[in-house]
UniProtKB/Swiss-Prot annotation:
Its main location: membrane. Pfam families: ATP-synt (PF00231). Belongs to the ATPase gamma chain family. Signal peptide: none annotated. It is a peripheral membrane protein. This is ATP synthase gamma chain. It is found in: Cell inner membrane.
């Protein structure tokens, strides 16, 4: 059994670690709130863009953008969004499990897959377990611009436009609340019909007016669809950042609480040993006094 000096050293070491985890918990909580604000600010933009595109799509039944045309699937692409740093609980592991489940469905059909990765943890995962990574970006920070993450996204979209890929998914952790993050695999292109669903189409049939398009409706659809796809990916990145910080906050709180429990257990052992040592010393003194007398 450890002596009193060793137990005191362990308690001191755990207390130092507890201070670190508590500080990390507080930092993660602050970053989560800011990330959540940025995430919520972006949602109205994507929703407004979707409504405008829906109007254009239903106003022009003759033109179909490649992003809206389904074709037989021989190869799929995944834009995988992970964190750059660890200490975030099971956030990335759960995401990789959801991704693997989706990939398995296509592997059973002999469909090949390739990956564009955003985040250092994703790069490490594919280095360890394999997978064709066509492009990657890391160190995007807590407040990335779209230019920072654009390269792998654009490379994947170019492959889709050129017919090298027949379907693209975006994989990320959806922020539900501070305690819950949901691993999500959403089809990006071709855009599912639900993206411009019955609500918008119903509205269009009721309207007797239309826009005046400059230079023409095809050019507008091409431009706006590209920006809409970009907004979806960027929003997914912001959701993942908020999820990362909330998961790290919860993980660090659990670590802080566990450290407290461990300190209490060690303190109890320390007190018992100290009491036993005092009792032993008293017994020795009493025994010595009795022998002298």
């Amino acid at each position: 059994m450890a002596n009193l000096k060793e137990i005191r050293a362990k308690v001191t070491s755990i207390q130092s670690t507890q201070k670190i985890t508590r500080a990390m918990q507080m930092v993660a909580a602050s970053k989560m709130r800011r990330a959540q604000e940025r995430m919520e600010v972006g949602r109205p933009y994507a929703d407004s863009m979707r409504r405008v595109i829906s109007h254009l799509v239903h106003a022009s039944s003759d033109y179909k953008h490649p992003y809206m045309v389904s074709r037989p699937v021989n190869r799929v692409g995944y834009i995988v969004i992970t964190s750059d740093r660890g200490l975030a609980g099971g956030l990335n592991i759960n995401l990789f499990k959801a991704l693997s489940k989706n990939i398995q469905k296509y592997q059973e059909q002999s469909v090949q897959a390739e990956f564009a990765v955003i985040g250092a943890k994703g790069v490490s995962f594919f280095k360890s377990f394999g997978g064709k990574v066509t492009s990657a970006v890391t160190d995007y920070g807590d407040k990335p611009t779209f230019e920072q993450i654009n390269a792998p996204v654009q490379a994947m979209l170019d492959d889709y436009t050129n017919g090298k890929i027949d379907r693209i998914y975006v994989v990320y952790n959806k922020f539900v609340n501070a305690m819950t993050q949901k691993p999500t695999v959403n089809q990006l292109v071709p855009l599912p019909e639900s993206a411009f669903g019955e609500e918008e189409s119903g509205i269009q049939t009721e309207l007797s007016w239309d826009y005046i398009y400059e230079p023409d409706i095809k050019t507008l659809i091409d431009e706006l669809l590209g920006r809409y796809i970009e907004s979806i990916v960027y929003q997914a990145v912001m959701e993942n950042i908020a999820s990362e910080q909330s998961s790290r906050m919860v993980a660090m709180k659990a670590a802080t609480d566990n450290a407290g429990d461990l300190i209490n257990d060690l303190q109890l052992v320390y007190n018992k040993l100290r009491q036993a040592a005092i009792t032993r010393e008293i017994s020795e003194i009493v025994g010595g006094a009795a022998a002298v007398s």
